[in-house]
Structure formats: C-alpha cells, structure tokens
Amino acid sequence: MSSRYSPYRIRNVGERRRVQERLLSEFNSRPVTAVAAVCAVCLETYCVQSNNIIDFLMPSECTHLFCYKCVLNMYKNAMNVPRAAVSCPMCNKKVGTWQAFFPNSVVSCKFIKKTGDRTPACLQFMLALKTIQDRYMATEEEAETEPSFVIKNLQAQLDAAQKEARDLQESMERQKQAHNVAWNSSCEQVTALQTTLADMQAQLDRSEALSSTLAEHNRAANVQIDSLRRAVQRLEAAQSAPVSVNVEFNDNARQNTNLHERFRSYVYSTVSDMMIEDSIKSLQSHVFGAACLPCSVNVEINFPFDE
C-alpha cells in the first residue's frame, strides 16, 4: 500500500478503525518520511512529515479525512440552519467529535457553536488567503532551485565582488599615493645628501690644499729656523771669541781714498755686528754704486773654532 491512504473501499467501521490503527502503528515504526494526504471534500493533496502534526481531522464515527478549511466550511454552513448538526459529506454520519493526529498520539476535539459576533467576511477572506499562501508557499529547497532565487543569489555575489574590487582599488590607490610621497621624499633626501657630500668633498679638497700649503710653509719655516739657528750659533761663538778682519783692495780701489775709508769703516762695523759676508757685499754696492769701477774685496774672518 502506498503512503497515500484511501479507506473508501472498506465498509465495516470496526475494520476501518483497525486498519487505521495498523497504519498509524506502521507510520510510528517507520522512519520519518513525507506523507501525502488528500482531503475527501476539496481533493487537495497536502505533503506533511510523518513525525509532524497532521493538518487533517477525522470524525470519530468514520475514517474520512478532511482538511481544516473544509471542516470550518461545514460548521459555517451549519450555523445558518437552526439546530443543524454537522454530518460527514461522504457517509452522511453525524459528527460529534473529531480526531486530530499528532506524533505518536490521537487527540479528540469538539467544536462548540458560539452565539457571539461573527467574524467579518473581509477578515475571514484575509485569514483564509494567508492560510492558503502559507500552505502553498515554496519550501526552502524549492526556492533555492527557482531561477529568480538563483539570479538574486548571483546578483548578490556580483555586488559583493564589485564592492570588494572597489575596496581593493581604493586600497591600491592609497598605497600608490603613499609610495609616491615616500619616493618624492626619498629623492629629496638623496639630492640633499648629494649636495652635502659635494660640499664636504669641496671642503676636503680645500683642506687638503691648505694642508699641503701649510706643509710647504712649515718646511720653509723649518729651513729658515735651521739657518737662523746656525746663524745664532755662529753669532754666539763669535761673541765669545776675538775676530780678526783683513780687507785688501786691488789697484782700482785706490782711485778714491775717501770712499775707501768710508767703506772700510762700514765693513768693520758690519762685520763686528752681523758677521755676514753678504751684508758686506750689499754695503759695497750701497757705497760705490754704479759710478765706481768694480773691485774685488777679500775678507778673511778667523774664528777660534775654525783652527
């Protein structure tokens, strides 16, 4: 027997109940499966899970299944007829109580007629419409396979990818700007360092040139100092010992006796003061000048340490 049960072939009520109990026990022992039930009035098929509440009612007097919508319509039609009882539309048996099927249990329920204000027709229509919409609403698995759902999902993924691409582009732009700023700063620093290095190199060259000049001056000064030291030594030695000076003139020097006497006095005074032979020659040039004839002067200086 399929999961879709139709008890219309069985005429005996007791046998129908036994079949129903057996089916319920089989349903309870079986794993959770999808069950398709058909309303006996509207013939609409409803898919439910075997472990969930079944949205069907069955009269206690028979085994016909009715959906809630059809049961409510039965009571609504009976409300307009005084002292009318609700009967099964299939077997015309009066219905006193109804059985609702819950997981592993069967609950009996009874509808009580109230004399209060009736629900407006517009509200009833809206409630019935909402019930039908909820009942026929696509399941999550069916919605995932619909083209509109797939398109929305792809569109959402595309929007997310575009947003990520924009964020990445903005991040790259910021990094590029930061890199350009750092590069420009580095170039300026390198230029400044090169300028400073060139200035330092020029200063170093000037320092080297000045050092070489100072070294030459030092060498010249050292030479002069050595010569002066030797002269001082000679002067000190000359001052500590007597000096004999002999001056001889040739025949040309006798032409002017006054000049020779004057020159001789200068020679003695200079030799006694400076003890330098070059000074004697400069004095000769100063005294005689260019007017006199050249003459030779022999100056012999005897020091005690030359012996």
Swiss-Prot record:
Single GO MF annotation: DNA binding
Q: Which SMART domains match?
A: RING
Report the stretches of sequence that form zinc fingers (RING-type). Answer: 39-92
- What PROSITE patterns does this protein map onto? ZF_RING_1 (PS00518), ZF_RING_2 (PS50089)
What Gene3D superfamilies does the record point to?
Answer: Zinc/RING finger domain, C3HC4 (zinc finger)
List the keywords (alphabetical). DNA-binding, Early protein, Metal-binding, Zinc, Zinc-finger
Answer yes or no on keyword Zinc. yes
Q: Spell out the protein name for this chain.
A: Major immediate early protein
